[in-house]
Regions:
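Structural recognition of the beta-strand scaffold that forms the well-ordered cores
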Residues: 63-65, 114-116, 149-152, 179-181, ...
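N-terminal Lys/Arg-rich, disordered targeting/topogenic segments
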Residues: 1-7
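Loop/turn elements at helix/coil->beta-strand transitions in domains of secreted/extracellular proteins
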Residues: 110-113, 145-149, 175-177, 220, ...
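Active-site-adjacent mobile loop/cap segments within catalytic or ligand-binding domains
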Residues: 219-275
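Active-site-adjacent substrate-binding region
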Residues: 198-225
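Solvent-exposed coil/turn segments that connect beta secondary-structure elements
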Residues: 65-70, 154-156, 183-185, 245-247
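A short, glycine/acidic-enriched catalytic loop
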Residues: 83-86, 159-197
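N-terminal catalytic or cofactor-binding beta/alpha core of small enzyme domains
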Residues: 11-148, 156-165, 255, 259, ...
């Protein structure tokens, strides 16, 4: 993460935090807007946003990307796509790029500076996707780009751990479960990678986001998962993998989680910056 001065941004960040803390009330005031193929998502009203706007150079910065770019959701009448294989598609209207687009919009509405990398990392083979997404990250950082947060946005695979439930309901909206994943880089045998993430710091961020998510929409976030893989999280502190729903969710349910994630990050960032 970049270090930043606190003084001139305090009022703006407090405004962000106040807006995000009011997540439930703000969500009830959000207006539905139409997106292609009649999938409804929610967008904050302009007059609900913080009045103290951050200057571009002061905005907290986020990089969004998708190592498993073609992951997709359950097809519905309003979300029909041509699959590359089951629950996967090249169609950017229905794969993880659509979720990243929506999350980027929600974050920008809350004052974040967002870069959304839309590179497809799966071709020519899924097994090399993390190597290719790492090359993108290293190239950006070597070019001098800096980010407060680097999020790899995925969707989970449905399993019995979900106990048949995929969503929480809030104000008539079905919101897909979210899960934060932290990589230790130790590897399955303990030998691991030469370069490993500062995973305790990433875990601290993941837990703070999980708590903020569940405060905004009770039960929406599952417990943080810590795994032995690296998931490219060694490139920076503030690097996490975010699972937005699973393959049994609909795209609409995944999109409904994006405003909640954005609100949670605004709250967490304000609290961390003003400490």
């Amino acid at each position: 993460m970049r270090s930043r001065g606190k003084g001139k941004r305090a009022a703006a960040l407090l405004a962000l935090a106040a807006f995000a803390c009011a997540g439930g009330a703000a969500a009830r005031q959000m207006q539905a807007r139409r997106v292609p193929l009649t999938i409804e998502v929610v967008a904050p009203q302009a007059d609900a946003l913080p009045a103290a706007a951050l200057q571009d150079e002061e905005k907290p910065s986020v990089l969004l990307y998708h190592t498993h770019t073609w992951e997709a959701y359950e097809m519905t009448e309003d979300a029909q796509y041509v699959p590359t294989e089951t629950w996967r598609t090249r169609d950017e209207r229905f794969n993880m790029l659509r979720v990243g687009e929506e999350l980027a919009r929600c974050l920008r509405d809350l004052g974040f500076s967002v870069v959304h990398d839309t590179t497809a990392f799966e071709p020519p083979n899924l097994s090399g996707a993390y190597t290719r997404s790492l090359a993108m990250l290293e190239a950006r950082l070597a070019a001098g780009e800096t980010y407060d947060y680097i999020f790899d946005i995925h969707r989970d695979a449905y399993s019995g751990l979900y106990n048949g439930a995929n969503c929480v309901e809030q104000d008539g909206r079905r919101i897909a479960y979210v899960m934060l994943l932290v990589g230790k880089g130790t590897g399955a045998t303990g030998s691991g990678f030469d370069e490993r993430p500062d995973w305790p710091r990433n875990l601290e961020l993941a837990q703070a986001l999980t708590d903020a998510l569940n405060a905004a929409a009770p039960g929406v976030s599952r417990e943080v998962k810590v795994k032995s893989g690296r998931f490219n999280q060694h490139v920076s502190t503030g690097a996490l993998l975010i699972e937005v729903g699973n393959n049994r969710n609909t795209l609409a349910e995944a999109l409904a989680a994006c405003p909640v994630i954005a609100q949670a990050l605004a709250q967490v960032h304000a609290a961390r910056t003003l400490q």
